């Protein structure tokens, strides 16, 4: 099996069911006691080092400027340097970040962890954050044009000795990035979009597409039909351009004696550590993600992973309860069997 597996670096925005994250939210509001360590960062180190050991391939460092979350670039740089195989996927918001600065940050991180960094372009985001941090909120086609310019400038600076660009949103005159990425192939660009224009943007500009399905989907069969249609549509678009785009998915993965048991255990763990959790996060992000078919018995999950790979997916960026024990269990029950020589036995369960 060639499927790659990823997970989210644990930060308050992206994590549920974690006592360390619950503590980090309170801890972030005040100075640390002398000698104390930040709970959020320590969980990230422990979790991703365990994930590195059991075969995970990628970690997404999401960015939430208005919140208790650590800055993605700082968090990624501090943790990725301790890992051996995991690639750091760092989120960036055009409109809040300057492309020249991001090009330098990316080149720096790529030299610290050669070939193990990529950029997740977030084209649409939380308006309140943009307003608070002085960003410019754009809509529709304007937003895509800005993002395309942003990416073109980064790639130009990585590639050329001297690079100039004069666009609608950015201008660079005789720009020089004297620190180049470590590898000849520049850092890859990931993004997500569901609109027709957004899909064209992915095909024209990005290397990876996070495929989404309707959050209103009520069954795994409905999700699979939606994913199949989306990939068929994108395959037709890439065939017209000749560009290769890789496909990724964000399912929630939870182990249990059945799908119902896995979901029940997950919900209990969430409420055990936070009696008043972010219900929006659960209802809009976690519960729909469980319908991708990756909860339940390990053998059933392994078979679903194989179906997703057969459909064309190359990466599963897993949503999960962020604990070292859970990560190790997923490595032992899902990743290792699928990558072993005994693939037939792994799928048979």
Task: Provide a role label for each language-model segment.
Residues 1-34, 126-129, 168-186, 263-293:
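N-terminal small/glycine-rich loop or linker at the start of catalytic domains
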Residues 49-53, 76-85, 106, 110-117, ...:
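Acidic (Asp/Glu)-rich catalytic clusters
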Residues 1-82, 186-187:
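N-terminal beta1-alpha1-beta2 module of alpha/beta enzyme domains
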Residues 70-90, 146-153, 232-237, 331-349:
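Alpha-helix-loop-beta-strand connector modules within alpha/beta enzyme cores
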Residues 2-38, 95-164, 210-226:
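Flexible, glycine-rich active-site loops centered on histidine and acidic residues
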Residues 58-79, 213-224, 319-329:
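Glycine-rich, proline-tolerant flexible connector loops at the mouths of alpha/beta enzymes
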Residues 11-42, 92-100, 141, 183-196, ...:
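Active-site mouth loops of central-metabolism enzymes
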Residues 5-9, 59-61, 87-92, 117-121, ...:
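Hydrophobic faces of well-ordered beta-strands that scaffold small-molecule active sites
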């Amino acid at each position: 099996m060639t499927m790659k597996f990823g997970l989210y670096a644990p930060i308050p925005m992206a994590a549920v069911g974690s006592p360390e994250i619950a503590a980090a939210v309170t801890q972030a509001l005040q100075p640390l006691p002398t000698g104390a360590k930040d709970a959020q960062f320590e969980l990230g180190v422990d979790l991703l080092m365990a994930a590195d050991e059991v075969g995970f391939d990628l970690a997404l460092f999401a960015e939430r400027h208005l919140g208790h979350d650590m800055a993605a670039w700082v968090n990624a740089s501090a943790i990725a340097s301790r890992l051996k195989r995991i690639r750091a996927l760092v989120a960036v918001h055009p409109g809040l970040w300057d492309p020249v600065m991001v090009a330098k940050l990316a080149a720096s991180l790529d030299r610290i962890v050669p070939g193990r960094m990529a950029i997740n372009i977030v084209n649409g985001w939380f308006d309140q954050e943009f307003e608070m941090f002085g960003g410019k909120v754009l809509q529709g086609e304007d937003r895509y044009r800005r993002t395309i310019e942003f990416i073109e400038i980064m790639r130009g600076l990585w590639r050329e000795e001297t690079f100039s660009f004069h666009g609608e949103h950015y201008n660079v005159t005789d720009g020089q990035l004297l620190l180049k990425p470590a590898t000849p192939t520049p850092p890859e660009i990931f993004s997500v979009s569901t609109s027709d224009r957004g899909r064209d943007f992915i095909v024209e500009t990005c290397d990876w597409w996070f495929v989404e399905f309707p959050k209103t989907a009520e069954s795994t069969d409905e999700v699979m039909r939606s994913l199949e249609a989306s990939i068929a549509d994108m395959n037709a678009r890439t065939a017209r351009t000749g560009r290769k785009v890789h496909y990724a998915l964000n399912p929630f993965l939870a182990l249990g004696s059945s799908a119902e048991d896995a979901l029940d255990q997950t919900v209990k763990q969430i409420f055990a550590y936070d009696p008043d959790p972010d219900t929006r996060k659960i209802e809009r992000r976690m519960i729909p993600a469980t319908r991708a078919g990756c909860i339940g018995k390990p053998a059933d999950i392994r078979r679903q992973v194989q179906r997703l790979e057969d459909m064309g997916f190359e990466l599963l960026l897993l949503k999960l309860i962020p604990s070292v024990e859970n990560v190790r269990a997923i490595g032992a029950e899902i990743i290792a069997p699928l990558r072993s020589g005994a693939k037939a036995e792994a799928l048979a369960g």
